[in-house]
Structures are given as C-alpha cells and as structure tokens.
C-alpha cells in the first residue's frame, strides 16, 4: 500500500500514518510467515530426499545383510568340509598304519559316528574299532612278521663271511646292503 493512494482517498496525514503503521505490522507478520513457510518447504524437501536415500540404503542394507548371512553359511560349510577332510585323512592314515591291505574296504566297515577328535586333537574311537576288526577279519590286514635274521653272505672264493673284506671294497658294500 502506498501513502499517495491513501491521501488521494481524502485521508488526513495522521490517518495515513496510523494506517501505514498498522500495515507495516501486518506486513512484518506476513513476511515472517512467508519466511517460515519457505523454511518449512525447504525442510520438507530435505526430509523427502533423506527418506528416499534411506529407502535406497535400506534396500542396500537388506542386500548386504543377506550377503553376510550367505557368507557366514558358506564359511560354516567350508569349515565343516575341512574338518571332515581332516578327519578322513587321519582315519585313512591310521588305517594304513595298522597295516590294512585295502583302506577303502576297512573304512567301509567302520562306524564313523564314533570316530572323533578329542580336545587334544587325537582320534578317539578308531583304534578300538581297528583292533576289533583286525581280530575278526584279519584277512584285511597284512600279517605282522617278526624281523628276520640278516642274510649271511660269503665272499667269492673265501669260504667265510667278510673274511678278507676291505671296508671300501665293492664286495663289502654289497654284503652290507644285503644285510640291511
């Protein structure tokens, strides 16, 4: 509103001043409300953007959570598989140490549920089964042969063992290899 407009209407200067003062107060309120509205619009826009970002991130978080769970499961399966392989290797090695002729055949006759590693990393439950199996099905295992006497060899033409044999000679070396 302008002063000239009010004076053209026939108002005296005191009336124009009081109308302009009231108009100024109203304009300040209006401008304050307008600034508040603009700030709220800006805040609303920022919040809308944040909500959209959070929606996008929540989808990413869900995907990441699923990936983490899958990786945990894969890791658990790999650990179980590694433990099973370690147990299988230890069982096979022990079976061979017991002198089994066919490790697969012996392994098939074992109760694998009773075979475990104890807290110290030693196999439990296997040795008893192998001893029992060796007693009942001894044909699966090689015979325990006692160590025999060394072969007695005679040097050519001497008639006695190692008589006249020089330690560096070829004949002595052959005899020592045979006796070992």
Swiss-Prot record:
Keywords of this entry: Viral capsid assembly, Viral release from host cell
Name of the protein this chain belongs to: Capsid assembly scaffolding protein
KW tRNA processing (keyword) present: no
Subunit structure: Homodimer.
A matching Pfam family: Phage_scaffold
Family statement drawn from the similarity comment of this UniProt entry: Belongs to the SPP1-like scaffolding protein family.
A GO BP entry: viral capsid assembly
InterPro entries reported for this sequence: SCAF
Function per UniProt: Scaffolding protein involved in the icosahedric procapsid assembly. Coassembles with the capsid proteins to form the procapsid, in which the scaffolding protein is found within the external shell of icosahedrally arranged capsid protein subunits. In a subsequent step the scaffolding protein molecules are released from the procapsid.
């Amino acid at each position: 509103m302008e002063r000239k407009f009010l004076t053209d209407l026939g108002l005296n200067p005191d009336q124009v001043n009081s109308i302009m003062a009231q108009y100024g107060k109203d304009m300040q309120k209006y401008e304050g409300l307008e600034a508040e509205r603009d700030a709220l619009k800006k805040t609303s826009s920022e919040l809308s953007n944040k909500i959209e970002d959070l929606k996008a991130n929540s989808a990413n978080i869900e995907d990441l959570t699923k990936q983490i769970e899958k990786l945990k499961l894969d890791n658990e399966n790999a650990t179980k598989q590694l433990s099973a392989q370690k147990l299988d290797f230890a069982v096979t090695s022990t079976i061979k140490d017991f002198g089994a002729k066919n490790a697969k055949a012996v392994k098939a006759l074992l109760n694998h549920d009773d075979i475990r590693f104890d807290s110290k990393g030693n196999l439990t439950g296997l040795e008893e089964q192998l001893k029992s199996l060796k007693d009942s099905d001894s044909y699966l295992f090689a015979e325990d042969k006692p160590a025999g006497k060394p072969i007695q060899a005679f040097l050519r033409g001497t008639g006695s063992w190692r008589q006249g044999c020089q330690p560096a000679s070829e004949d002595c070396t052959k005899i020592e290899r045979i006796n070992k």
